[in-house]
Every structure is written in structure tokens, then in C-alpha cells.
Amino acid sequence: KCDFGSYQAPYLILSPRKFGKTTWWRNFVVEAWGDASKGLLISCGTESGFHALDNLQVEEALEWDAEYDEETDHRGLVQIIDDLIDNNKEYGIKGVCFDTFDTLYDIAAAETLRICRKETGKNCKSLLEAWGGYNRGPERIVKLIQDQLTRLYRAGIAVFILTHTKFKERTDPLTGEKYEQLTNLMQDRTYSAIADNAQMVIVGTLERNING
């Protein structure tokens, strides 16, 4: 039987908005591990696609690093993963799914700016100027994400990442002709840093027939 947690790499699920990625995860958990309690959806930042679904174990990570707040009943993504790793013998979680890559990136970006201000003592306003520029800001974001994913891999927990797709205009390097390519919503460098090491990349599409 396939052990999804034996691969130290994520599974990426790409599709257009409203495709049903979160529903897919809800159904997959029961199919793969027999019980909804074996999977955890981490809804990142402003993502809120889980509210209409039942039989789904979910926790919201509105920030990257934040201690539990009794008033809001929320904690940071790092604290969620800390809890998983420390107590998973009790929880029995087999797989974690991040919903979505772009909102995961957003909370990591906010944390990166906070770290930059703390380390440099400067009022860093954008990722492009973080640590003097030269792409150091985006590189730190990727490292933050990869570090947390690695913690889950090493704990034997399968990692899935949901992300959106869009059409991007490309130019053929030989002919110079422009064409559209269905691809991810992220910047190429950020996406490649995760996707190039993925165990599997699954792309869902919607086909519509309009009559009349």
C-alpha cells in the first residue's frame, strides 16, 4: 500500500478557482486513510474555502508566527506545526494540506518583512528592498516555507499544497510568437523552488460547453 508520508517532497494540486480543490482534499483524506481525522487542512491567511464543507478537520493560520490567542482562537502556522510534531502520536495525522500556496506565501512575506526590520533596524517597506535587495527578500520567503515543510516531512507527515492556476503569456524563443500557457499563480522563481522538488504535480482543468 502506498505510504504518502514516505516521500520527503510535497504533492502540488493546481487548478482554477472554484474547481473544488478543498473538496478534493476532504474526499482524499477519507479515501487514503479511512478517517477524516487523519488529515489536517491548514487554511492560510485570507483563504476561506473550507466553510461550506463538513467532515473536514481544519485550522486557520492567519499569521506565520503567533502564540495562541484565546480571544480569536487562532495561532500561527509555526505553532500549529510545532503542536503537530510534538503531539502527533496522540493526533495520528497522516497528511497536512496547505490551502493555498499563494496565501501561504502572503503570510510568509509578512513574516519576512518583520524579520528584516528586526535584523536591520530599518523600516523595510517592500520585499525588493529587504536586506539591500538582490532578491534576498523572496529568497528568505522560500526558505521560511521550505523549513516548515521539511519539519513535516521528517515527522513522516505527507504534505499537500493547493494552488491556483492562470493563463500566462509566453514568447517562443525561436519564433518570437506569443502564446498562452496554463500555469500557476505564483512568480516563476517562487513556484519552481517548491514544484521542482515535488513528488507529484497534479493539474485540474474545467471544460465548459456553451450551447445556444
Identify the meaning behind each predicted range.
Residues K1-F98, D102-I107:
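Conserved P-loop
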Residues H74-I81, Y134-Q146, E180-D188:
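Well-ordered, non-membrane alpha-helical segments in soluble/globular domains
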Residues Q57, T112-L113, T175-K178:
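Short secondary-structure boundary/capping segments
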Residues G92-G95, R154-I161:
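Loop/turn-to-beta-strand initiation segments
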Residues D106-R140:
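A solvent-exposed, charged loop/short amphipathic helix patch at secondary-structure junctions
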Residues S6, V159-G212:
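Phosphate-binding/switch region of NTP-binding enzymes
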Residues F50-H51, L104-A109, L113-C116, K168-P173:
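Short acidic/His/Gly/Ser-rich catalytic and metal-binding motifs that mark active-site loops
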Residues L144-G156:
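Catalytic-core regions built around general acid/base machinery
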